[in-house]
C-alpha cells in the first residue's frame, strides 16, 4: 500500500502493522486515527472485521491462543501465539479481527438445520467428549433432526441421510455395514440383511444402508407366489426353511406378501381350473408331508381349482375327458398292474402291456395306470366300399366290405400296395370306353389314394377285367357292368396293347379289356409283282366272340394273348403282302378291295369270300376291312400318278364346262323369246287402257257441265235446311242453359239455407253447452263452499235467527206467531195450536247452553 503516515481506521475495521525493527506484526482496530512511525509499515488497507451473524459460523485456520478469560496470548516479543495447523470454529460473537497468521478458511456459513426424518452422518476425526458421550477417532454416529447442528473441528459431516418412507404393502431391505444394533435393539453382524415392514418413515442407522424398497405381491384367489429359500432360516411363523426349499404362498396365508431377504420369488403361479369335462395328470405330486413324490403321477378330475405346487407339472396340460358315442371307442394299455372291470362288469386283473378296448357311450378319464393308445371311430362303409384289416397278433389280413366296422384292440388298418402303372391308371379316372382314343392327357393333380381302403374298379359294359390271386394262385375274369373289389392278395392284370398309326407296341396301358365291336387302323407297306411299292391305310372292325361267360376256361382265353391288337394287325398285314405280291400294279389298282378282302378273309368251299377272320387263341373276330388310302411309296410314281389323275380331272372338267356353256346359251335364247313376247303383250294392254281413259274423260266433261246448276240448287237448299236446324238447336240450347242456371241458383239457395241452419244449430249448442258448464261451475262452487263450511255450520247459521225470535216471543207471552217476511223463514211450530186455543202457557224452563 502507499506510504501514508496517517491512517484512519473506521469502526469495526482493522489493519496489520509491521514493526520493521523487530519484524513483529500487530493489529490496530478502529475507530481510531493511526499515525505510522518511520519504522512501521502498514501491511494492508483497513479491512472490516469478521462479523458472524446469528445461526452462522466460520472456520479459522491457525487460530490465536486464548487464556481462560478469552484473552489473546502473546509471546515474549509481543507476537500473538498461534495454534499452527489447528482450526477453530467460531459462532455468533462480536466482530473480531484476524490476527497476523490467522486465515479465514471457511467464510460466513449458515448453520446446518437438520429437519425431521433427516440425520447427519458424523465421523470423529479426533478423540472427543461431549454431552452425548466419549468418541474416539474413527467413530461414527448420527445427529438426528429436528435440530440445528453445531459443527466441531473434531467431527466431519460424511453425508446427509434422508428417511425412507414405507407405504402400505412395502418394506425396505437393510444391510449392516458392520456389527451394530438396529432400531429394535437386535444385534446385526456385518453383511446381514433384514426387512423393516412398519409403515411410516424409517431413518437408517449409521451402520445401516438401504439396499432396496421391496413391494408386496398382492395375492388373489387366482394367483399364488412361488418362493425358494436361498439360505436356511426361520420364517415369521417360526417354521424352518432350508436352502433350496420351495413352497407356495396363497391368499389363504396372506393377501399381500413381502418376500424375506432369504427368499427368492421364482414366479407367479396362476390357478389351474378344471371344468366337469376336463382332467389333468400331475407329475411328481407333492405328498401330505409337503415333499414331491418323484416319478409318481396323480390324476385330478374337474370340477376343481388348485395351484400347482413347486416341482409339480402337468403332463400334456389340461386334457378333455374322452366323451365317446356309440360309434367310438378307446384302445387302452396297462402301464401297471391294476384291477379293472370289463364290459360285463366282471373284475379282471390287467397286467403291464395288456391292451383292451372300451366302447361308448361313456365318459372316460384314464387313471395313471392306463395309457390311451388310440381313439377309434367306426368306419362307415357302403355296400361297395371296404377296408383292409390286419390282426396284429396273427398277421392275417382280410377285407371288410359293405358294413360299418370298428377296429378292435388287436387290429389295425393295412395299406395295400399296387404297382405304379396300376396306381396311375386308377388315379387317371379315364372312362375306358369314352376316353379310349386319348393317349396322353394333361397332367392333373389327383389326391393320393387311401391305401387302407379296398381297391375298387368299375368294369364298364361289354368289357372284362382279369384279377389274379397270388395266394390262391388262380385268376378270375369279371365281365361288366360290375364293381371289382380287390382282396388283400389280388392284383389286376394290366394289358399292354399296340397303338397309334402305324401300330407300335406298348402304347396303350389298360386294366379292362373292351369286347367290341370296335375298329383299329394300321398302315402297311406292300410291293406288287412289278415292284411297285405302295402304302395302304386300313381299318379293321373287330370283336370278341364269347359264347358262355360263366365258363372260366373260355373267359380266360381273352387274356391269353397279351397284345391282341399287335398280333392281329401283323397277321392281317402278312396275308395282304402275300396276296399283293403276286399281282401287277394295274390289276391291284383296279381290284384292290377284292384282292385285300380275299387275302384277309379267304374263300369258303363255294369259292366265295368269307365274312370274317377268326383268331382261335382268344376268339378275336375281324368282320370287315376298310381301305382308306393307297399311296405309292416311290416319289416319281406318286408324281406320275398324281399328274395322270390331274389330267383326267382336267379333261372331265373341260367337258362339263362345255356342256354347261351350251345349256346356258340355250336357256338365254328361250329367255329372250319370252321377254319379246311379253313386251308385245304389254303394248296391246297399254293401248286398250288408253282407249278406256279417253272414254272416261268425255263422260266426265258431260257430267261436269250438267252438274254445276244442280250442285248450286242443292247447296242453297242444304244451307236453308242447316240454318233452320241451327235455329232450333240454338233455342233448345238456350232453354237448357236457362234450366241449368235455375237449378244452379236453387242449389245455391238450398246450400246457403242449409249452412245458415247448421250455423244456428252450432251456435245454440254452444249456448246450451256454455249454460250447462256455468251451471256446473256454480253447482261445483256451491258444493265446495258447503263442503268447506260444513253442514253443521250451515245448520247453525240457518237456525240462529229464528230461534232467537221464538225465544223473544215466548218471553213476551205471545202464543201464536206467523211471520210472512220473504227474507226470514216462517215459524209454524205453534201456529195451529194457537189458532185452536189449545196452547198452554209456556212453562218456565231453565235455559240451557
Curated annotation (Swiss-Prot):
This is Major vault protein. Residues 430-452 are annotated as: Disordered. Its main location: cytoplasm. The vault ribonucleoprotein particle is a huge (400 A x 670 A) cage structure of 12.9 MDa. It consists of a dimer of half-vaults, with each half-vault comprising 39 identical major vault protein (MVP) chains, PARP4 and one or more vault RNAs (vRNAs). One of its GO terms (cellular component) is nucleus. Required for normal vault structure. Vaults are multi-subunit structures that may act as scaffolds for proteins involved in signal transduction. Vaults may also play a role in nucleo-cytoplasmic transport. Keywords: Cytoplasm, Nucleus, Repeat, Ribonucleoprotein. It is found in: Cytoplasm; Nucleus. CDD domains: MVP_shoulder. Gene3D superfamilies: 2.30.30.560, 2.30.30.570, 2.30.30.620, 6.10.250.720, 6.20.380.10, Band 7 domain, Major Vault Protein repeat. It comes from Xenopus laevis. MVP repeats lie at residues 2-55, 56-110, 111-162, 163-215, 216-270, 271-321, 322-378, 379-454, 455-517. Signal peptide: none annotated.
Amino acid at each position: 500500500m502507499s506510504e501514508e503516515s496517517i491512517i484512519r481506521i473506521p469502526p469495526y475495521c482493522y489493519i496489520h502493522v509491521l514493526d520493521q525493527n523487530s519484524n513483529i506484526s500487530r493489529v490496530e482496530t478502529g475507530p481510531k486515527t493511526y499515525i505510522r512511525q518511520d519504522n512501521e509499515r502498514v501491511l494492508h488497507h483497513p479491512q472490516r472485521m469478521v462479523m458472524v451473524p446469528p445461526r452462522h459460523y466460520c472456520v479459522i485456520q491457525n487460530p490465536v491462543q486464548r487464556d481462560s478469560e478469552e484473552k489473546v496470548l502473546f509471546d515474549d516479543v509481543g507476537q500473538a501465539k498461534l495454534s499452527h495447523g489447528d482450526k477453530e470454529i467460531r459462532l455468533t460473537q462480536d466482530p473480531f479481527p484476524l490476527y497476523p497468521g490467522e486465515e479465514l478458511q471457511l467464510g460466513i456459513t449458515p448453520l446446518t438445520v437438520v429437519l425431521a426424518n433427516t440425520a447427519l452422518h458424523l465421523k470423529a476425526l479426533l478423540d472427543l467428549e461431549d454431552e452425548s458421550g466419549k468418541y474416539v477417532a474413527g467413530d461414527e454416529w448420527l445427529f438426528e433432526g429436528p435440530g440445528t447442528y453445531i459443527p466441531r473441528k473434531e467431527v466431519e459431516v460424511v453425508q446427509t441421510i434422508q428417511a425412507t418412507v414405507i407405504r402400505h404393502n412395502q418394506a425396505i431391505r437393510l444391510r449392516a455395514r458392520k456389527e451394530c444394533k438396529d432400531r429394535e435393539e437386535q444385534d446385526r453382524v456385518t453383511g446381514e440383511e433384514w426387512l423393516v415392514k412398519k409403515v411410516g418413515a424409517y431413518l437408517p442407522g449409521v451402520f445401516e444402508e438401504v439396499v432396496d424398497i421391496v413391494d408386496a405381491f398382492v395375492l388373489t384367489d387366482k394367483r399364488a407366489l412361488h418362493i425358494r429359500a436361498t439360505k436356511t432360516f426361520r420364517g415369521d411363523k417360526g417354521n424352518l426353511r432350508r436352502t433350496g426349499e420351495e413352497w407356495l404362498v396363497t391368499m389363504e396365508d396372506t393377501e399381500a406378501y413381502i418376500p424375506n431377504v432369504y427368499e427368492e420369488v421364482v414366479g407367479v403361479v396362476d390357478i389351474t381350473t378344471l371344468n366337469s369335462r376336463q382332467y389333468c395328470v400331475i407329475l411328481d405330486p407333492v405328498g401330505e408331508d409337503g415333499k414331491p413324490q418323484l416319478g409318481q403321477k396323480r390324476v385330478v378330475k374337474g370340477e376343481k381349482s388348485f395351484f400347482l405346487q413347486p416341482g409339480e407339472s402337468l403332463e400334456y396340460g389340461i386334457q378333455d375327458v374322452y366323451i365317446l358315442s356309440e360309434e367310438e371307442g378307446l384302445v387302452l394299455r396297462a402301464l401297471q398292474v391294476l384291477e379293472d372291470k370289463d364290459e360285463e362288469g366282471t373284475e379282471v386283473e390287467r397286467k403291464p402291456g395288456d391292451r383292451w378296448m372300451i366302447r361308448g357311450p361313456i365318459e372316460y378319464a384314464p387313471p395313471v395306470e392306463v395309457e390311451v393308445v388310440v381313439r377309434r371311430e367306426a368306419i362307415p362303409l357302403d355296400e361297395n366300399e371296404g377296408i383292409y384289416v390286419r390282426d396284429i397278433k396273427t398277421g392275417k389280413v382280410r377285407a371288410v366290405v359293405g358294413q360299418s366296422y370298428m377296429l378292435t384292440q388287436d387290429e389295425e388298418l393295412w395299406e395295400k400296395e399296387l404297382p405304379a402303372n396300376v396306381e396311375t391308371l386308377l388315379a387317371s379316372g379315364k372312362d375306358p370306353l369314352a376316353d379310349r382314343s386319348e393317349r396322353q392327357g394333361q397332367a392333373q393333380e389327383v389326391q393320393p389314394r387311401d391305401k387302407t381302403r379296398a381297391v375298387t374298379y368299375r368294369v364298364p359294359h361289354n368289357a372284362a377285367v382279369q384279377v389274379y390271386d397270388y395266394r390262391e394262385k388262380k385268376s378270375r375274369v369279371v365281365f361288366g357292368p360290375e364293381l371289382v373289389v380287390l382282396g388283400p392278395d389280388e392284383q389286376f392284370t394290366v394289358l399292354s396293347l399296340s397303338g397309334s398309326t402305324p401300330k407300335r407296341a406298348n402304347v396303350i396301358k389298360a386294366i379292362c379289356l373292351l369286347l367290341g365291336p370296335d375298329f383299329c387302323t394300321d398302315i402297311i407297306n406292300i410291293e406288287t409283282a412289278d415292284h411297285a411299292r405302295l402304302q395302304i391305310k386300313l381299318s379293321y372292325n373287330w370283336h370278341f366272340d364269347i359264347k358262355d361267360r360263366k365258363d372260366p376256361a373260355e373267359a380266360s382265353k381273352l387274356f391269353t394273348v397279351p397284345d391282341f391288337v399287335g398280333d392281329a394287325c401283323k397277321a392281317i398285314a402278312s396275308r395282304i403282302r402275300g396276296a399283293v405280291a403276286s399281282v401287277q400294279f394295274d390289276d391291284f389298282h383296279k381290284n384292290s378291295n377284292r384282292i385285300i378282302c380275299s387275302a384277309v378273309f379267304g374263300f369258303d368251299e363255294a369259292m366265295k369270300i368269307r365274312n370274317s377272320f377268326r383268331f382261335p387263341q382268344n376268339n378275336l373276330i375281324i368282320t370287315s376291312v376298310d381301305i382308306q388310302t393307297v399311296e405309292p411309296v416311290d416319289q416319281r410314281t406318286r408324281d406320275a400318278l398324281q399328274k395322270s389323275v390331274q389330267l383326267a380331272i382336267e379333261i372331265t372338267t373341260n367337258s362339263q364346262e362345255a356342256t354347261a356353256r351350251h345349256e346356258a346359251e340355250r336357256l338365254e335364247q328361250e329367255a329372250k323369246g319370252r321377254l319379246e313376247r311379253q313386251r308385245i303383250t304389254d303394248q296391246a294392254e297399254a293401248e286398250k287402257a288408253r282407249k278406256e281413259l279417253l272414254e272416261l274423260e268425255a263422260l266426265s266433261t258431260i257430267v261436269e257441265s250438267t252438274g254445276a246448276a244442280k250442285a248450286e240448287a242443292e247447296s242453297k237448299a242444304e244451307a236453308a235446311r242447316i240454318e233452320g236446324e241451327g235455329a232450333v238447336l240454338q233455342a233448345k240450347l238456350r232453354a237448357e242453359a236457362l234450366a241449368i242456371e235455375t237449378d244452379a241458383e236453387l242449389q245455391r239457395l238450398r246450400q246457403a239455407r242449409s249452412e245458415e241452419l247448421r250455423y244456428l244449430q252450432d251456435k245454440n249448442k254452444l249456448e246450451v253447452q256454455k249454460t250447462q258448464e256455468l251451471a256446473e261451475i256454480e253447482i261445483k262452487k256451491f258444493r265446495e263452499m258447503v263442503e268447506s263450511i260444513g253442514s253443521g255450520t250451515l245448520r247453525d247459521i240457518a237456525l240462529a235467527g229464528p230461534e232467537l225470535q221464538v225465544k223473544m216471543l215466548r218471553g213476551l207471552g205471545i202464543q201464536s206467531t206467523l211471520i210472512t217476511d220473504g227474507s226470514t223463514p216462517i215459524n209454524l211450530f205453534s201456529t195451529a195450536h194457537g189458532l185452536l186455543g189449545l196452547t198452554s202457557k209456556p212453562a218456565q224452563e231453565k235455559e240451557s247452553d
